[in-house]
Amino acid sequence: MLEKLDLSKKVSKEEYNRQMEVLGERLGKAQRLARDAKRPIIIVFEGWRGARRSALINEMMQQMDARGFNVYSSVRLRGVMQEQPFFGAFWKRLPALGHIVVYHRSWYYLKNANELADKEDNTKYPAVSFEHINNFEKMLTDDNYLVLKFFLHLSPEQQKKNIVKNAKTLGKAWRDLNPAIDESEDYDKFLPHYEKMLEATDTVNAPWHLIADDDPRSARLEVFTKIADAIEKAVQMPAEPAADKRTAATYDVLSTIDANKELTKEEYKEKLDKYQKKLTQLQIEMFKAQIPVVIGFEGWDAAGKGGAIRRLTAALDPLGFHVHPIAAPNVVEKQFHYQWRFWTRLPQPGNIAIFDRTWYGRVMVERIEGFAKPQEWQRAYDEIKDMEAQWSEHGIAIAKFWLQIDKEEQLRRFNDRQADPNKQWKITDEDWRNRDKWDAYEAAVNEMLVRTDTSYAPWTVVEGNNKYYARLKVLKTVIDLFERKLAEKNQ
């Protein structure tokens, strides 16, 4: 790909200034169009060391309103990358609707550094697959993000000139700002690697723009033109991904579950004390092993999620866990991709994040109530599995619970809540409306359980008509998970 670039083309200063008078106005207008259309934009600048990324980005900022975008460098994110899944830092830095985020080196730099740095240094850089990169970018573009990727290509001669010039100008500051792998030491070694990267991640939704950077004026004009063109086109023709075309299937998991499991109060109290003591000790061991945990609870209204969470957390040190109640997204959360609010709540190593309702709302309530378009919730199954796979690969232990009660038991609990002044706060008009849609929700839950049950993030269906049994099953499942992860860690 790179060998096809014409590195000899040049633009005079006069011609550059003439074109920038028009192009600068286009860039400013394009930014305003994106803001008005609430179109979030990510611009990635990659390329050889010595490429003029900083000068290019600075020139672009002069043409736009700096209040509308942020600039980040993955070189400076290395310190926080090891404590979270690879894309965690990038999810936290997503642009809000109508805003722009610019990357002066991005996830591509970190992947290259991991693969090309000396063996004793590559552990400083997190690893990621091309598949996860493509999935990440596709999730964003499917959700109306515009992702623009530029690779600034230099000849080996020009690269050496640029590096020498920068080193003389900035001295030690240049080395401190660029603690990166030094491509200049072996240009021929890095060239095929970059070719492979570009080929593997040049996709329809987020294609690479290859820029000849030996002449900086020519490079800037080409980059700015492509940015203005892309934004103008994106605003005129908003992305509208096709719906999932797979044949509809009927899933039936819940009908095989007998929600009635017997357990006396005496048996419950005896085992509850035993399980909670065990869990207290295991939490300490998980913290020592620095294993993060994500536990998600889903289930029918009045299925007992709150009670199960209380018995679980009663055994835990409050400094080591956080319960995240998930409701409808608020004003801030609506500015981002639906997964954003979960990526930003991931636990630190050794800590536990408990979600009362989860990311699966995308394929349940958002599906049934029409908050997500068909193509949005249909693709969410694969998006969620990819997200959970990334968490698991990072070492996060994942437990997912569906608390199952039958329709008659739910009605009994609803009536009990309405009759008890101390419990009336637990029942809402929305609960009754959801009950009227039982069959639709049941179909959605069945599909969710089948399509997102994986070895790394399996579903546990909890028979919930007997609250005592349900609470103990949750505790025992978490205990088993902790013991298994500790055994794997010690292998």
Question: What is the predicted function of each stretch?
Answer:
Residues M1-Q491:
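Glycine-rich phosphate-binding loop of ATP-dependent small-molecule kinases
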